Amino acid sequence: MLVGVVYNHPQPLPYGEAKDKISEDAVLEEVSDVQQALRDLGHHVVLLPLKNDIAGFVQKLSSTPLDCVFNICEGAYGCGVHEMNLPALLELLRIPYTGSPPMALGCCLDKATAKRVLLGAGLPTPSFKVVQTRFEPVGPLPYPLIVKPSREDGGRGVSGESVVYDEAALKERIRYVLEKYRQPALVEGFIDGRELNVSLIGNDSPETLAISEVEFTKLPNGFPRILTYDGKWLEKSREYADTPVTCPASVDASLKRRLEEISKKAFQVLGCMGYARIDFRVDVKGEPYIIDVNPNPDISRKAGFAKSAEKSGLTYPQLIQRILNLAINRFSTFKPAEPVRIRKMEEEDVPSVLNLLDSINAFKRMEVAVAREVIEAYLKKPEGGDYSIYVADYLENQAAGYICLGPTPLTEGTYDIYWIAVNPRFQSQGVGKKLLRFAEQHVRSLGGRKIIIETSSKKEYEAARSLYVAHGFKEVARISSFYASGDDKIIYEKNLSN
């Protein structure tokens, strides 16, 4: 499979603490781990970082013949509120993707909205109040309370000062969140007890993995028993050392059953898909309360989710493949809007094919002119000539794609694919794959032994190269700076006898 790994390329943060950049940058480690696992599994991988050039990102995404996107994007422009927009885009482009849909991501990021959904489903979560201004009354919530940004994840904005015991400390912490994070503050009852994490994997009927626990026994007296941002991300900090995570957690059968039941229901009512992690606090009476639902948790090798999977019998590559399979199964209905038929090119197809070539930015005018000459030569002698040209049938009077191939001069059974192009409107719909499969079948029917494709090393041809590799072509030669300085000729080969 050709899998695109989409992630938010680290950007300057528009608000928050300077140290918050550490969690923003951590996505690169996650990308590396997922990419390596996919390659170890035999998949072809294209990295698709989301930077500030959104138009360029969309163009690359829509022009790459992806079988699936592995989505580990957590926002854009350094801001998590855009996390939900990426899967929304993928759905519009009809590209399968891993993880939760837009509504689940948006709902869970806004902690107050998620809590309202949970309460509406009869699930336990601490009492809360969303505070929009410094002077807004909190109401009758009993102390101690915990104050945190209402639309952040990764522990941003959470420190020892987040737990407050009186009105003065409450007002100061609300002021801090409003000014530093530029968003409403979530004030909720603080459950002074155990903190447990339940990881889930699945779609409509998720299963739970081994439960983890954040240990607080090493924290100094007087420090609130919470996992802070420093405890999550600053590996050299005292709080990181004092809050280790144990997996599997020591929980009795009754609590384990209760945690699993609540987690599965929360996963479903919030619309999560693929995988998620749910964080609990357990009070002195043994009652669990949901404090956070993360529909897009860190799945790097060293992260808690992967450790829970390992303790449940899944190796890291198996976990990644499982997540990928869930996405493929979920989006099995994503098909081209209309069936595509491949047939021989005819005279009336010329304007449509030339328009197709003109619409692809990677092709220069000179290249399009050469393609025109080849088409004219073919039409003069469509049978027994040097070229065979086929089109993928029309989409609203535009060819969905075309391919030009022919026997390589002075060889026996070797064929060249000279041109292959897909209408941008039909990219990522399997047209390129269908054209290549057709070409392979055609060459086999003629007794051909192998197919050669020559192409450029330029970035603009990356999608085409990925298509060739995904279809079984192997790079066998490269001529440095053949087309221009820095633009290599890459030669791909596929032996049909294998």
PLM segments and residue spans:
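Acetyl-CoA-dependent GNAT
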Residues: 340, 344-418, 423-425, 436-438, ...
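Conserved GNAT acetyl-CoA-binding A-motif
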Residues: 443-456
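ATP-dependent carboxylate activation and anion-phosphoryl transfer catalytic cores
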Residues: 86, 119-122, 250-339
